Amino acid sequence: MSGSAKYSDWSQVMTLIANAAEQGNHQPLLTMLMTPDEREALVARVNIFHELLQGELSQRQISQLLGVGVATITRGSNELKSHTDEEKVWLMDLLEKSTKSELDVEKE
């Protein structure tokens, strides 16, 4: 037994996920690591970011749309504010492309 945790920071976890993705196994890894509630919370966070980046709804409207508390929306908004405009554009582009890719798969 070692005296410390094998994974001690976020970058190590990101490397683990990247390695799994290279093998095409990121989905089972994340499914194993996260409880259903954690996965649901992550889906909510992705939707929060998507709605905030679109900028069409108020935080209260997003809260009602997604069924999450206003404080949850505020935390997402505060996190977004800590990123550059370039990062926000990249994320919005990724979110839009991912949605379109999913729709294309459903049509097939």
Swiss-Prot record:
Q: How does it assemble?
A: Homodimer.
> Transmembrane ranges?
none
DNA-binding segment(s): 59-82
Localization annotation: Cytoplasm
UniProt protein name: Trp operon repressor homolog
Any one GO CC term of this protein is: cytoplasm
Q: Which species is the source of this protein?
A: Aliivibrio fischeri (strain ATCC 700601 / ES114)
| Superkingdom of this protein's organism | Bacteria
